[in-house]
Amino acid sequence: MSWNTVVGLEIHAQMATQSKMFCACRRQAGALPNSNICPVCVGWPGALPVLQGEAVRCAIRAAICLGCDIQELSRFDRKNYFYPDLPKGYQISQFYHPYALGGSIP
């Protein structure tokens, strides 16, 4: 049996938006701890995230620049983790239906 090497790349980028991805709290580097938070940020029961359009536009522009295929259907999912530095116990992810697929770095 022969094996082929397969290498994947997952890219995370911090976007230069005024607010966070799923709430209207300011995205401010260097701010005092817990000064730019809301019920959505800390995962309070009943607090629902609201996707910020500015962040989506930045993500789509980046995907176009990388030559990705922009998908017509997109969905967010919760990925549950039990890490001490993740008090909500989950991350919001696009594992199954991301905004973009493929692409390359020229």
Predicted regions: what is each one?
Residues 1-106:
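Basic, nucleic-acid-interacting segments
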